[in-house]
């Protein structure tokens, strides 16, 4: 899902954190997070929820269902 990948990169860049930092916070390995950002893999529901909470946006925003972050 390309929009998810783009939004993850954008949000991480805005927050000025590394992929590794985000991965540790949401409880996944860095390689898995890289795959999310590369559009090679989509997170499961629990990880998607953790990412949305960490970036303080809705899961719908991450998935491209809305352009309103919250």
Regions found by a protein language model. Name each.
Residues 2, 13-14, 42:
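Short amphipathic helical patch at the helix-1/turn junction of helix-turn-helix
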Residues 6-25, 50:
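Short basic helix-loop element that most often maps to the first helix and adjoining turn
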Residues 8, 22-23, 33-36, 62:
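Conserved hydrophobic/aromatic packing and binding residues within compact polymer-binding modules
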Residues 27, 46-61:
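DNA major-groove recognition helix of helix-turn-helix/homeodomain DNA-binding modules
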Residues 27-42:
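Recognition helix of helix-turn-helix/homeodomain-like DNA-binding domains
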Residues 37, 55, 66:
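DNA major-groove recognition helix of helix-turn-helix
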Residues 40-50, 69:
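Short, basic-rich loop-to-helix N-cap that marks the start of a DNA-contacting helix
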Residues 61-70:
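Short, charged recognition helix plus adjacent turn
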């Amino acid at each position: 899902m390309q929009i998810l990948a783009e939004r993850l990169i954008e949000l991480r860049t805005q927050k000025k954190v590394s992929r590794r930092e985000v991965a540790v916070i949401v409880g996944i390995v860095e390689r898995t997070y890289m795959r999310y950002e590369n559009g090679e893999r989509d997170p499961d529901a629990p990880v998607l929820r953790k990412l949305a909470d960490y970036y303080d946006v809705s899961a719908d925003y991450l998935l491209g269902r809305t352009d309103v972050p919250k």
